[in-house]
């Protein structure tokens, strides 16, 4: 709501969120990039997981003190959150994360950013329209989404014409554990739309599935492409260190 004079009917289960947000605590680097695309940098008051962020202007703002470094998204810095006094917290509801701990008890409105739980790439992309309304950028967000949607469908029509489908193994292990997209996830759909044969397309479910290194290696040896997402510079030596196979 934009009517700050409305009578309060907040409870433990329900909070009033006043829009547009002017000082948000953003917990994911993904959403920082999205907000930057919409031109809402000034509404970002604090961010988590700075080490995963590649936006130079945000890092500079943190260095200058214009944006608060809130630490880990799993255990945000409570003192800095209190000092920030944000309009809302924007965390992602990662499975088995244990919630936000003490941050949930501070009384700030929490807007769970569940876009990663969508089972199609365009379904996830359309969440920008929701964020656009939170930050007073509805028209900008709608325009961005329509461009992305049109381009995505155009690319899909091209990949459907290909005769060969390279076999794809995605991801790397995290802390020694492989977790790969299940068949109903947006990632699996993305691989399919890109014209690849995802070698673990038989994994049931909509999220991710933990797998043993043995199983990944056994089937991964059949892959033509190993698709790795990494937030920094990556070389073969580092891959061998992080992924001893």
For the regions a language model picked out, list residue spans one by one.
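A short, gly/pro- and small-residue-rich
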Residues: 43-44, 102-115, 236-245
């Amino acid at each position: 709501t934009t009517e700050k004079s409305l009578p309060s009917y907040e409870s433990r289960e329900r909070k009033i969120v006043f829009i547009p947000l002017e000082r948000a605590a953003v917990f994911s680097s993904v959403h920082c990039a999205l907000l930057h695309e919409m031109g809402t940098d000034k509404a970002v008051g604090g961010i988590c997981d700075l080490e995963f962020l590649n936006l130079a202007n945000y890092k500079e703002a943190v260095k200058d003190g214009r944006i608060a470094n809130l630490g880990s998204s799993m255990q945000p810095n409570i003192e800095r959150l209190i000092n920030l006094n944000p309009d809302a917290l924007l965390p992602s509801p990662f499975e088995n994360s244990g919630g936000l701990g003490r941050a949930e008890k501070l009384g700030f409105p929490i807007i769970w950013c569940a876009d990663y739980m969508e089972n199609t790439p365009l379904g996830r992309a359309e969440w920008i329209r929701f964020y656009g309304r939170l930050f007073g950028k509805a028209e900008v967000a709608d325009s961005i989404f329509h461009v992305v949607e049109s381009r995505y469908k155009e690319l899909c029509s091209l990949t459907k014409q290909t005769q060969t489908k390279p076999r794809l193994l995605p991801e790397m292990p995290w802390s020694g554990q492989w977790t790969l997209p299940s068949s109903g996830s947006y990632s699996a759909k993305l691989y399919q739309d890109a014209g690849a044969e995802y070698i673990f397309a038989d994994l049931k479910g909509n999220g991710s599935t933990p797998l043993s290194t043995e199983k990944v290696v056994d089937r991964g040896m059949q892959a033509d492409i190993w698709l790795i997402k990494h937030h920094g510079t990556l070389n073969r030596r580092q891959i061998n260190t992080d992924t001893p196979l």
